[in-house]
């Protein structure tokens, strides 16, 4: 049986072949140029919607990173101040030991009092110190900040947690730590009067200094624990971020090797179709169309 094709059918077939090859070549060229596998959600609804979810996850990851950096900086500032305050508390405790020497006279006690007062003034300044942005290092209140999924930590060190109750950032002289040190200063002043009378016994003064020292060091340790949590969260979120980026790339980004091969194939077909159509145009078969 002989199959016959009309001239119009041959012409339309040639035109359609060129259009198909051109469309495919342009599509692959767009993917190579943009680096994106899909231009519209309709190209692959699942992949694009999954990509949107990945974008959301990456945005959350960026939020976690910002929170981690903020918390790490806040606690680093607090720890620097508390390290110094702990050293000053140790100096006060050494002064207390010196004050128990039986060889001291009233002038010696007055000299120790001056040293203790100077330390207290320096500590008060550190209690109310501000960071580089002008915010108090030890705030009257702190927030809970999420550093990774389902993990919340204190944004910083609370003023009363470090220095005891009774005072605020505006009234540091009312905190337990300040009052305990002030009692030591008063004790030294009274010893310098050589009356034999003191408002507080040495045991009471020592107990107050030790209580404030213990509270400060415990707060410093807790802050260090938060810093370790942040470090662990950074490590975990960094690995998760790499996984998200890889997944998104595999899902949405153009596979350049495959796309280049497909583009080359489509371009070859287009060139062949154009050449064939050119020969058909020159043929007598279409001279009367």
Predicted regions and their residues:
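Amphipathic alpha-helical polymerization modules
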Residues: 1-139, 186-289
């Amino acid at each position: 049986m002989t199959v016959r094709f009309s001239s119009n059918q041959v012409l339309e077939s040639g035109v359609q072949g060129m259009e198909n090859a051109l469309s495919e070549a342009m599509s692959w060229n767009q993917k190579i140029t943009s680096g994106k596998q899909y231009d519209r959600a309709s190209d692959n609804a699942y992949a694009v919607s999954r990509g949107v979810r990945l974008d959301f996850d990456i945005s959350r990851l960026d939020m976690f990173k910002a929170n981690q950096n903020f918390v790490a900086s806040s606690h680093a500032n607090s720890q620097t101040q508390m390290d110094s305050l702990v050293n000053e508390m140790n100096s006060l405790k050494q002064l207390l030991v010196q004050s128990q020497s039986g060889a001291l006279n009233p002038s010696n006690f007055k000299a120790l009092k001056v040293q203790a007062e100077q330390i207290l003034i320096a500590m008060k300044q550190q209690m109310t110190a501000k960071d580089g942005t002008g915010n108090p290092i030890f705030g009257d209140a702190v927030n809970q900040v999420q550093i990774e999924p389902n993990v919340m930590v204190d944004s910083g060190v609370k003023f009363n947690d470090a220095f005891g109750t009774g005072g605020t950032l505006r009234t540091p002289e009312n905190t337990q730590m300040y009052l305990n040190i002030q009692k030591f200063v008063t004790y030294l002043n009274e010893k310098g009067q050589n009356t034999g009378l003191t408002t507080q016994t040495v045991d009471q003064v020592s107990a107050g200094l030790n209580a404030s020292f213990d509270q400060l060091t415990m707060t410093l340790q807790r802050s260090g624990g938060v810093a370790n949590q942040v470090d662990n969260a950074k490590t975990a979120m960094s690995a998760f971020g790499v996984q998200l980026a890889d997944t998104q790339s595999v899902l949405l980004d153009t596979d350049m090797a495959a796309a280049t091969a497909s583009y080359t194939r489509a371009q070859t077909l287009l060139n062949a179709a154009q050449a064939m159509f050119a020969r058909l145009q020159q043929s007598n078969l279409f001279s009367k169309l």
